[in-house]
Amino acid sequence: MFKKYFLWLAASLLVAAPAHAKLRVVTTLQDFSSIADAIGGDRVETFAIAKGYQDPHFVDAKPSFILKLSKADLLIVAGLELEIGYLPPLIDQSRNDKIHPSSPGYLDASIGCDILQRPTTQVTRAMGDVHPYGNPHFWTDPNNGKVIARAIAAKLSELDPSGKSTYDKNLAAFEGKLDEKDKEWLAKMAPFANAKIVTFHDSWPNFAKHFKLNVAGHIEPKPGIPPTPSHTLEIINLIQSEKIPAMLVEPYFDLKTPNYIATKTSAKVVVFYPSVGGTPEIKDYFSLFDRNIDAFVNAMKGSK
């Protein structure tokens, strides 16, 4: 009888034993949390500070972010000073030594990526909001997405060695799907190779390089500087003279100036989402490109 009781007790304890504790991953962008979810699976729990419909340069720091950071095992950032305006004080106030920049629980996703527009001269405020270490919108190139995924897999394996086989398997699946999707995206964009475009902000050099587009100008006169009447006239003249068919505008910018330019030219306004979560349909890193490329292709076909 006692033997049966102890067997029952042992079985009960095994059933009641807590499952593997999930790694708490906080990211500054939903793009990184999407990739971390794909790699980590049910071994991670993710939270993104900036939502996909928000300007990642300007994030309102909330007390809830400090709480999330205080419990985080891993913090994934874009780096290149994209988060310089809000993140350092949040990290300090979290009092979590695991996620400081010199700690194992901190991952700069830009490392190893193809970073464009690294300044070759001293950066001054007269140049606008120029990032001194290069353009931080690097995740808009699928090749960089693969680099980011590999870095996340390596970091998760470092923090959770028992999950390495899971992370490696999920990484292989992610890379395989990304390769297949990229073939599809490149095929859709191929008819528009070398097309000239105008963008509101300088967010798309990596996207343009990968998909062979030429960014001819920006609606902002300088990065972070609102459109002016004189510069708007210059853009109108540029679009007319170069027969530029499309303007890419992020969802958090005022459409007043782009729409005005559209009335004076044949260029179409195309709302382009720089991050996962920009709309409900953009649920992950793959659907981010699906949505933007379909919107671009439809606009270009309509401009003919």
Regions found by a protein language model. Give the residues of each.
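Extracytoplasmic metal-acquisition and chelation regions
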Residues: 21-304
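N-terminal secretory signal peptides that target proteins for export/translocation
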Residues: 1-3
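Bacterial N-terminal signal peptides
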Residues: 5-16
